[in-house]
Amino acid sequence: MEKLRLNVALLRKRVPNLTTAAKSVGLRPATVSNLSTGKIPVGRAEVRTIVALAELAGCTLDELILRGESVEMIETGIKILDLFAPIAKGGTVGLVARPGMGQLVVLAEMLHRLKMEGYKTILLNPKDNHPEMNDILDDVDFVANSIEETFNMMISAGVDKKFVLTADRAYVLSGEMYTLQEMLDDKDITEVTTFLLDLKGEAVDDDLPYGPLDTLWQFDADLAARHKYPAVNPIYSTSSILEGSYLDPVHHGVQQKAQKLLRRYRELRSIVTVHGVGRLPESELQVYKQGEKLEAYLTQPFYVAEPYTGKKGVTVGLKETLSDVKKILESSPSEFNAEDLQFIGKIES
């Protein structure tokens, strides 16, 4: 089957305020978001949806739909992200969270890890005063105060470099991120992976808070409240890389089974919270216990948090993550203990 995906970069460039534009032609912003991230494969989209998007972008269908192009994944060594919502190299990642869910810790960890991989890291300072951003400065190479300054820093560093750019949602809403994208396109600077965050916590109420994204990290209040970090929701977080035709079959199979288990586990957990575990039949109890183990395994110590947690940061390769998750999915009730799986790296044989 031919690989098809939306030209997300073109949509971002041509339709700055996609939420409003989509609604104006009768499209649900959530549908557009799911098509952009690959949660809904392009091949399964309604024809009228694709045509409407092409009309909004003022482009042909051939320009809107990319055929046969590969999407390269940046492996982070963070289990929950690499498994459920991997980063597309040169793509845009949107973080959706309310304050206190740990998005800045995840962002700081990403900057730390990518800097170690040779990326030049740039922070575009927020328009408003946000002293909490000081926490990520240790792993930022350059701090810019405007789009022009950001662009000039990239030019000075060299167009052949790999960049990571962090920016607040305000720059998306003002249209300045699209201006920067045009400037980068003019100079053929393509190795820019962007992290967008919403420091005001308003993005959670918007179906399409940043416009089209390659990767969405939806943070979870329940996980944060129970100190299951990183508190990234494995059900609602997604990536264009997860579109079946792009993904390694083993990764795709494990990801689908793990997500199915966690979805059911969350349903059962709501019952257990109210009525206790004794209310579950034996078959469901096994599912619940497996979900508990998997949720625990997906927690992970971060390098940037070492001074606060006293735990050494760990990196787990994707191959090891897939192998470990497969073991948990196939485990018997007596195998593994959820407490022993919490905040570890890989499962030691």
Ranges and model annotations:
Residues 2-3, 48-51, 55, 59-91, ...:
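P-loop NTPase nucleotide-binding/switch module
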Residues 15-35:
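Short alpha-helical DNA-recognition segment
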Residues 82-347:
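P-loop NTPase catalytic core
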